[in-house]
């Protein structure tokens, strides 16, 4: 929740989106933590890539 709150504080009206938490399609490298359910892919609700670090 702290990351989502930080996003809302930095950019009012923008929400954090989790786009993938488990990879069953093989989109990540073989060593990816997505296969263990220990990684997530995130974006912002406005999908403004200039906000991504």
UniProtKB/Swiss-Prot annotation:
GO process terms (BP): cell fate specification; cell-cell signaling; proteolysis; regulation of gene expression; smoothened signaling pathway
Keyword Plastid: no
Keyword Metal-binding: yes
Top-level taxon in the UniProt lineage: Eukaryota
Localization per Swiss-Prot or TrEMBL: Cell membrane; Secreted, Extracellular space
PTM note: The C-terminal domain displays an autoproteolysis activity and a cholesterol transferase activity. Both activities result in the cleavage of the full-length protein and covalent attachment of a cholesterol moiety to the C-terminal of the newly generated N-terminal fragment (N-product). This covalent modification appears to play an essential role in restricting the spatial distribution of the protein activity to the cell surface. The N-product is the active species in both local and long-range signaling, whereas the C-product has no signaling activity.
A GO MF label: patched binding
Residues annotated for Ca(2+) 2 binding in this entry: 20, 23, 25
Cellular-component GO terms for this entry: extracellular space; plasma membrane
InterPro entries xrefs: Hedgehog, Hedgehog_sig/DD-Pept_Zn-bd_sf, Hedgehog_Signaling, Hedgehog_signalling_dom
Pfam families: HH_signal
Transmembrane segments: none
Keywords from the named record: Autocatalytic cleavage, Calcium, Cell membrane, Developmental protein, Hydrolase, Membrane, Metal-binding, Protease, Secreted, Zinc
Annotated Zn(2+) binding sites: 34, 41
Residues noted as binding Ca(2+) 1 in the record, renumbered to the chain: 19-20
SUPFAM superfamilies assigned to the protein according to its UniProt record, in alphabetical order: Hedgehog/DD-peptidase
Record-stated family: Belongs to the hedgehog family.
PANTHER family according to UniProt: HEDGEHOG (PTHR11889), PROTEIN HEDGEHOG (PTHR11889:SF31)
Role of this protein: Intercellular signal essential for a variety of patterning events during development. Involved in dorso-ventral patterning of the brain and in early patterning of the developing eyes.
Name the UniProt record assigns to this protein: Tiggy-winkle hedgehog protein
């Amino acid at each position: 929740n702290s990351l989502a709150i930080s996003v809302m504080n930095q950019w009012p009206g923008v929400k954090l989106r989790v786009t993938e938490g488990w990879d069953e399609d093989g989109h990540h490298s073989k060593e990816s933590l997505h296969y263990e359910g220990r990684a997530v892919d995130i974006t912002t609700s406005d999908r403004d890539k200039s906000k991504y670090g």
